[in-house]
Amino acid sequence: MQGDWVLLLLLGLRIHLSFGVIPVEEENPVFWNQKAKEALDVAKKLQPIQTSAKNLILFLGDGMGVPTVTATRILKGQLGGHLGPETPLAMDHFPFTALSKTYNVDRQVPDSAGTATAYLCGVKANYKTIGVSAAARFNQCNSTFGNEVFSVMHRAKKAGKSVGVVTTTRVQHASPAGTYAHTVNRDWYSDADMPSSALQEGCKDIATQLISNMDIDVILGGGRKFMFPKGTPDPEYPGDSDQSGVRLDSRNLVEEWLAKYQGTRYVWNREQLMQASQDPAVTRLMGLFEPTEMKYDVNRNASADPSLAEMTEVAVRLLSRNPQGFYLFVEGGRIDQGHHAGTAYLALTEAVMFDSAIEKASQLTNEKDTLTLITADHSHVFAFGGYTLRGTSIFGLAPLNAQDGKSYTSILYGNGPGYVLNSGNRPNVTDAESGDVNYKQQAAVPLSSETHGGEDVAIFARGPQAHLVHGVQEQNYIAHVMAFAGCLEPYTDCGLAPPADENRPTTPVQNSAITMNNVLLSLQLLVSMLLLVGTALVVS
């Protein structure tokens, strides 16, 4: 359904441009001078919030490099009927930005495990290791012990705050696991994934660590199968043995978690989640909505599976009950997986959903007492170019053919499963093909899975101490900013005054000039479509 909408959008925008309906006001220097003046006026009034932060939120767009951010902005605008680039993302309203250097200690191009250790625990680490220093070695169990490093979330819990993890991947995946786990192999999801030698040496699988390493108040995402004994039928897919429990130790980790605390609730579908969120007796909530990863948003059953924005809202509301504040980690994890598949449509629609979760959290919190950071763990070999006309679908074709006389999409990958060269020939691509949900953009090098990119990624910040996010920083700096703002170890003597008592939520500031411009663009697009329809009727 959404793929059909993108194709219609592509057609409409090309018609839009064929009639020359680029906003007339943009031809006048006054338009751009006024926009810059308004932005400058906002910047001149910007003052850092010098208090401590009661609440800490980290949004992690897995694989959301700067090219992905820009393409997401265009897609968000186009899905709203606009040309695209002028439409702001929710994260665009955050006033402080920086660049983060993402390399692992042992890899120039990183993975999500070592990077999670950096931005969550404050220490750079090795490839495929989580919650341990670089002294630990991949897959060597005995190098875990004595090399553990602890997340800011762990320190927040120790300080009396409530804590939560929300993700669209399995909750045992590399990024969320960085908040609670210590492991030398990111793939040790359950005991069934571990060698017997590691178990004998005392290493624990990630699912076990989820319920044993710390008291997490809210856990929302996928990953059911790693919590239940082998052969336990999945409640959603009881006839599919591939979705059944996989644990070899016969432990039911969900039951163990439920028995550990008062006020616990386990849910596995959207209806149960919404019911639990309205129950004041629920003080700890675990929601596992798929056996492994949650569905891509374009494939999500909206009545059965919660969106990332819905999970974020539930988490914020529940955690906000604690007068001492909270720490929340929210991951848009399938942005990364869409890119690995070489399928930009999946990656970018996930990123649009991720931005909607940021907007929801902004509506529910107050920047006076809540530090919110947005970043990525790494980038991807994803790019878009081709001198496309403004308003061309982000999934569309470049206006001119390549030297081989064939069309090509604006979006391309440096490597991945989209490699299509056959005896030196490359196929033509049509608008219909490039707009399909499952279309894999062409790649220069054949790989079964597209790789990460090694360039710096952006950090966006708002709230107390957000001004510390500046310049170009090592990725582990992120954890230190959050720990300092929250006066958490090792900054318990931060010397910061507590935040002012503000109860009203803050919402993203909307630029009135941008809003009016979007309205005009929508009207112009409508006029273009009506002209086309009228022309078609006359011809017929």
From Swiss-Prot:
Keywords carried by this UniProt record: Calcium, Cell membrane, Disulfide bond, Glycoprotein, GPI-anchor, Hydrolase, Lipoprotein, Magnesium, Membrane, Metal-binding, Signal, Zinc
Glycosylation sites: N142, N301, N428
CDD domains: ALP
GO cellular component, one term: plasma membrane
Gene Ontology terms, MF aspect: alkaline phosphatase activity; magnesium ion binding; protease binding; protein homodimerization activity; zinc ion binding
Intrachain disulfide bonds: C141-C203, C487-C494
InterPro entries the UniProt entry points to: Alkaline_phosphatase, Alkaline_phosphatase_AS, Alkaline_phosphatase_core_sf
EC annotation from Swiss-Prot or TrEMBL: 3.1.3.1
Subunit text: Homodimer.
Protein name: Intestinal-type alkaline phosphatase 1
Gene behind the chain: Alpi
